């Protein structure tokens, strides 16, 4: 498949002892890069026999690497030859590049690394055995940094059960082998995500850190509602905050004028609110969010970018759950966008986060009612009234229709009910008139819906987990345009038959269900969305436990 790695493994495997619980101490100021990377590292008296030197060094490296399968395999393959701790120019370049990258880790949204033990090892080198221990300590630090900056500091599934994303963890042996063969600075840079979103998030992180250093965005806005024509102290405070946030040009005006209405509208658009230009309770609550909270959202988004550090597809479908939209992207450009309805906020209805490939669409689909909905919702209804949900067929294990009169619903429990339920194709079908399939074990897909009124809501979390589309026909036309000259005619000819019809996509399209509360704009600026499932709050708490910090950094 286009974007899934062949090798994956748990993130906590082979954790380095260099990273203690705090991991908050950066390189000691008294230890310069030059001191750590220069010839002083190698003040080892030569032994009489070269073979004895090699033997002691090999033994030391083997012992120090024994707790890590990756390091053991790497050093066995290279004959236990140091790649960091010798006096060659290449080894010095590797040390310098790694230590510099580690020093700058907080600028990348990573927790600072505690290199106290490594510093002590480097200073204490007096023998070949010391050299071997220092070599492996550097290699462990490299692998820790490489995994953190490349695929994230957290294991997503351990944060929230709805984050079922497969992170593309790289094989440690290959990463270390390729590093040893490459320009070290270039290789370390290449570990980071290459997406434009990641680069823009880092820039916004730096900007917000400077905002914090300058004292923030000023006083919170009091009151509950402001609108055009008003003036007074509250309006002045609101104007000042909008100016500090960059939504309103500097001026001496003290009234809620047309410029201020436009600024509020722009703010509302950027925060997923109805753009009426009135600063009501919902808008004011977002205006009063402090920059610290926005910076935390940026740091979470950076971590999420690392979880998706793979090729997302030249054409792909991007469903941002918090934004209630579904987009078709071509070369990082939105070529189609529609509103969506996502899973409700109840824990068992929330839409999961994962990536897959769309393979086909079904026109005039039958709704095979999920087992959970059948026994939790419809069975109790039919126990009260056997004729309830009469639009649904009841079928046995062989797919044969069973008349309701033949079923004693009261005799069954959710675990013993032996039947399934289906809804035939129709305008009122729960899936509407088309569904888009990327087969997965979560039974999640995109589809039409007869409940069109929900798309007019600001917050659209109502489904059982699947993604409903406001404009499913146009979505289908955009997908089909690559395999037929008349996509609308092709689609409607099959729709008009009323029969269930499967249409294969000649080229499968990657689908990414994501959850981003901080979203950069290609031409500059940010958009923010509410953390409707509470997932980002969990991620931020976990990042803080790892040692990630909010920083105030002057320009």
Residue ranges and their predicted role:
Residues 52-169:
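Cationic-aromatic interfacial patches
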Residues 39-42, 46-53:
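Boundary at the C-terminal end of the N-terminal hydrophobic targeting segment
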Residues 1-20:
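N-terminal secretory signal peptides that target proteins for export/translocation
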Residues 2-3, 51-70, 74-76, 136, ...:
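Well-ordered beta-sheet/strand-loop patches within structured domains
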Residues 24-43:
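Bacterial N-terminal signal peptides
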Residues 8, 20-22, 51, 56:
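N-terminal, cleavable Sec-dependent signal peptides of secreted/periplasmic/extracellular proteins
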